[in-house]
């Protein structure tokens, strides 16, 4: 089946190839994508400016100071190699802190990095509620790995005690994301930003007490990855590199602090209001909730909480739901050297994303927090093709009703209705090639990989179209920002 997936991708990956066909000659984007990029960049600048104003009247509460610092770091484009991509570029509030550009959601599913011709192989996850994921561990009773962040759980949280903080350390040095060649470049640039005094107030005056080499600017302006013979191209003394590493950790912990704040992890959905007795579901929403907890089996992985648990709508494990490969991922076309000689995807058209199993077997080549506990390596085979079960909170949050969101690890699905229909009919409808006119209604492409595919909870749920709609209606109640109607 995996070979079959390769054939399909090679046959229909035309749009992915066309996106990068001009990769050495400028920005290969449509006018719609360019307009949306500009809109998001302007929005990021506005949020950053509004946050910088708050430096003039800092709260006395250190937790609030950390949250403000984390927000400033998250919205700072200067922390990317070309000074054009903040962390928030892929995680904006109006889209539920995930991808805010409908054109990419509708087409590629993944997003470009600071080097705009380099795309990731995965859809951006939400960072809302991410700090509530536990440190990655093996649950003997379940026989499952539980926790961590990223689709493949590689931000384990075991070093910093928080998977969200370790996740925040990945994108700055990922060549297909923010693209810095050395983590110390992020520290160097932060030391020259208006929030430096706040950082030193929170973390100590020694945070930026680093003797930077005279060529640091030039080194940090060159996109990663670093040369194989010079893996740490900012040539610091061992003492200064240790201090830079500690400060980089503190930057990440600040970002996780902001992600933990009520501004991001809010618990203000209609669902929460209903549970608090402040609102009521409609008949359709209630039907969807009953299906969610019963016939549709959603609650078996997207748990709404047990006694003493927050209703997180994930069990923090991983699963292979049999998602088809997304042939429109530009990553398939990144098998040749780009203008800077970098090859992001050494497998080219034969790339298969093996998820958690791939991380356990080989680590993750594109970003920093990828240390694998040797005790977990034997678990690689039983985790091939599995991806972390995402929270469903804010799964439908969008800036406007017709805004397209992408779903699953590779952004293959383009609506909640479509992915619910897939869960319902994966094993009922016949197979077809990607981009078949009947795709998604009368047939489905083959799974990207059938390894460890979930067959007990996905594939043949026996739901009617009306029941699918009811499930969607319920999931829409998980959008934060709900204001209960005033009692008469």
Tell me what each language-model feature is.
Residues 2-5, 15-488:
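Periplasmic c-type cytochrome electron-transfer domains
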